[in-house]
Amino acid sequence: MSHEMSKHGIGSLFGALFLFSTVTASGAASLPSYKDDYFAYPAIISSADNGDYKVIDYNEMRDINGRDAVPEKRVKDTYVSLKARAYQKDVTFQTAAGPVKAMAAGKREGASFIVLYLHGRGGNRLQGMNDFTFGGNFNRVKNLAALNGGLYITPDFKDFADKGEAQIAGLIEAVKASAPNAPLILSCGSQGGALCWRIASNQKAGSQLAGLILLGSLWDDGFFDSPAFKKRVPVFFGHGSRDPVFAIDKQEAFYREIRKRAPGYPVQFRVQGEDLNQLRA
């Protein structure tokens, strides 16, 4: 399984940031409990920065091998619910950068919150809507959004540079037009983080963000000059301790630099597993 195709971390990391970002940015309440016993953090090995930095216990049998009925292909049924499929559609959004194909689950008009997930290299819009792969985490995100008046979107895009930025900025403009008061959380896996930082620096789209999630991803010093940084948009990093693509020491250094440049900035860092494939909670 490639670094870009994360297996277990994404859903519960989203759940963690729903409270972190939406409460900080808009005063919204946390989402109701949904399969929390299956997706909650295991033991905390260490904690620093008043809890903003945590190292989470990792066990391969518990967190990977024991979770799937068919290894890396189908999670055990107890981790998923197919209720949200009733709210799921393959759609095309019309944007200033042209049509953008995406999977959408939830309330497309007047959503209470919006989550966009941008895949890494080799992924596509279907990855973030798969119910049974990735430990059931995407299914959990889908249900948290669809069953609580939110909207979860996983788009296709042309690249991780100018064209992709234009498409995602256009998509954000389109979905915000249908739910102008909804906090919008942009989440990015692996190389998709290049677009997270580009959108943060986009003069219009960057100011519309309510939260950023970087999963096993990269860093960008340009963030410090971005509209998102100036707005103090909350940032959440989830990273593996031995990530072979994006070294954890560099991502940790970037986390520290954010705290140094803007004391009290709402930023959190979680370490679990060895790479993006093992991120779970």
Predicted regions and their residues:
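Alpha/beta-hydrolase active-site loop
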Residues: K158-A179
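N-terminal cap/lid segment of alpha/beta-hydrolase-fold proteins
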Residues: I56-E109
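Short amphipathic alpha-helix adjacent to the substrate-entry channel of hydrolases
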Residues: M129-G150
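C-terminal catalytic histidine-bearing segment of alpha/beta-hydrolase fold enzymes
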Residues: G264-A281
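Short beta-strand element of the alpha/beta-hydrolase
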Residues: S112-G122
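Gly/Ala-rich beta-loop-alpha elbow adjacent to hydrolase catalytic centers
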Residues: S187-C196
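Short alpha-helix in the alpha/beta-hydrolase fold that links the catalytic acid
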Residues: A247-I258
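Short beta-strand/loop motif that positions the catalytic acidic residue
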Residues: F236-H239, D243
